[in-house]
């Protein structure tokens, strides 16, 4: 898949945005319910001198799960060890990490749903009993020893909570879903980032970027940095609404935050399948994108904004999608669509 300016996934240039990350809950904007609950749990754990209970953060990418994990460690005044599901290839890799933790440390596992089942099972006793069972030797002479681990906090992050095994999910004491951000919160995030970058920006300019940021802080910060480039070359370095709008149009991010891939997806459903329904695999083959990419990256925002609906027979474009693309709503769409493929019967 081509690199998208508005993808919520992390891009190579986003590492420069680490300076924009908040380091305390007081500086973290948005996700009020999640933040307020974590504040209570952290204060209580500190008062008791205990490790914070294990935390599962789930939701679409780019909403601040990694940032929250680091904030938890900072607020708890402990170290954080960061890894990811794909990086832990063998159970021994996870065992080595667990035995290296200091008391009350935070272990952050991104994409925790991608842990292998055998590796995942090591976490069961570690999370619940604070122990690690290790088998030494092979065959009849093999023996099992139990190591006691220091109290620690596992923070797991995932975009696919449904793929976690129930025994693992049930061992998290705190489970929080991160939602797409409201425009007002994104304006505050953009204004804060502009201050850190020593960039002059008007409220209207911040609003224009926020509206096109797909409810995602990572996208907002990325677009802000690109608009800054246009402001320095085209103008006097100050970001106004007009400058932001022209810059984002140039980047092919429309006023609703849709890019060429989003529009291609909607146009395919409308023009080739009479508005739908169309199954995921058929849509994937038609537009030339992987089904997983459509499901994880493209669809969440289109669903959240009401441009498509998912039905038992497949994806359907809504009236709002027609209106946004300036396409007349046809009778087949109003009747529920007749454009499903022969392949769609077995598809979601």
Swiss-Prot record:
Region (Head domain (RuvB-H)): 255-348
GO cellular component: cytoplasm; Holliday junction resolvase complex
The protein's role, per its UniProt record: The RuvA-RuvB-RuvC complex processes Holliday junction (HJ) DNA during genetic recombination and DNA repair, while the RuvA-RuvB complex plays an important role in the rescue of blocked DNA replication forks via replication fork reversal (RFR). RuvA specifically binds to HJ cruciform DNA, conferring on it an open structure. The RuvB hexamer acts as an ATP-dependent pump, pulling dsDNA into and through the RuvAB complex. RuvB forms 2 homohexamers on either side of HJ DNA bound by 1 or 2 RuvA tetramers; 4 subunits per hexamer contact DNA at a time.
Region (Disordered): 329-348
Binding residue positions for Mg(2+): 66
Binding site for ATP: 20-21, 62, 65-67, 171, 181, 218
CDD domains: AAA
Main location: cytoplasm
Key words of the record: ATP-binding, Cytoplasm, DNA damage, DNA recombination, DNA repair, DNA-binding, Hydrolase, Nucleotide-binding
Region (Large ATPase domain (RuvB-L)): 1-181
Gene Ontology terms describing biological process: DNA recombination; DNA repair
SMART domains, per the entry: AAA (SM00382)
Family: Belongs to the RuvB family.
Designated name of the protein: Holliday junction branch migration complex subunit RuvB
GO molecular function terms attached to this record: ATP binding; ATP hydrolysis activity; four-way junction DNA binding; four-way junction helicase activity
Gene: ruvB
Statement: the UniProt record of this protein carries the keyword DNA-binding: yes
Top-level enzyme category: hydrolase
Positions of the UniProt region annotated as Small ATPAse domain (RuvB-S): 182-252
Enzyme Commission number, as recorded: 3.6.4.-
Keyword Mitochondrion tagged: no
Location of this chain's protein in the cell: Cytoplasm
Entry domain remark: Has 3 domains, the large (RuvB-L) and small ATPase (RuvB-S) domains and the C-terminal head (RuvB-H) domain. The head domain binds DNA, while the ATPase domains jointly bind ATP, ADP or are empty depending on the state of the subunit in the translocation cycle. During a single DNA translocation step the structure of each domain remains the same, but their relative positions change.
């Amino acid at each position: 898949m081509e690199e998208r300016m508005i993808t919520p996934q992390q891009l190579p240039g986003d590492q420069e945005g680490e300076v924009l990350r908040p380091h305390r809950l007081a500086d973290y904007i948005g996700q009020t319910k999640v933040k307020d609950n974590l504040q209570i749990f952290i204060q209580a754990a500190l008062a008791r001198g205990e490790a914070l209970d294990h935390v599962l953060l789930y939701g679409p990418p780019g909403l601040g799960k990694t940032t929250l994990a680091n904030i938890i460690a900072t607020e708890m005044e402990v170290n954080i060890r960061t890894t990811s599901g794909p990086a832990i290839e063998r159970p021994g890799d996870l065992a080595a990490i667990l035995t290296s933790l200091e008391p009350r440390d935070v272990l952050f596992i991104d994409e925790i749903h991608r842990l292998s089942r055998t590796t995942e099972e090591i976490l069961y006793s570690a999370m619940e009993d604070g122990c690690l069972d290790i088998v030494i030797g092979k065959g009849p002479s093999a023996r099992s020893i139990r190591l006691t681990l220091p109290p620690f906090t596992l923070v797991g992050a995932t975009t696919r909570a449904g793929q976690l095994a129930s025994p693992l999910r049930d061992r998290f004491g705190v489970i929080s879903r991160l939602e797409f951000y409201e425009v007002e919160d994104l304006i505050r995030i953009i204004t804060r980032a502009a201050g850190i970058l020593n960039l002059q920006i008007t409220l209207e300019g911040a609003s224009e970027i926020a509206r096109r940021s797909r409810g995602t802080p990572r996208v907002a910060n990325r677009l802000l940095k690109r608009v800054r480039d246009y402001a320095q070359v085209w103008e006097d370095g100050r970001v106004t609404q007009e400058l932001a709008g022209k810059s984002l149009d140039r980047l092919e991010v429309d006023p609703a935050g849709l890019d060429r891939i989003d529009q291609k997806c909607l146009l395919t459903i409308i023009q080739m399948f009479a508005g739908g329904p169309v199954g995921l695999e058929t849509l994937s083959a038609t537009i030339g994108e992987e089904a997983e990419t459509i499901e994880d990256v493209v669809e969440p925002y289109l669903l959240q904004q009401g441009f498509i609906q998912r039905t038992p027979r497949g994806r359907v474009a809504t009236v709002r999608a027609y209106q946004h693309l300036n396409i007349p709503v046809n009778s087949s769409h109003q009747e529920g669509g007749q454009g499903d493929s022969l392949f769609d019967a077995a598809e979601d």
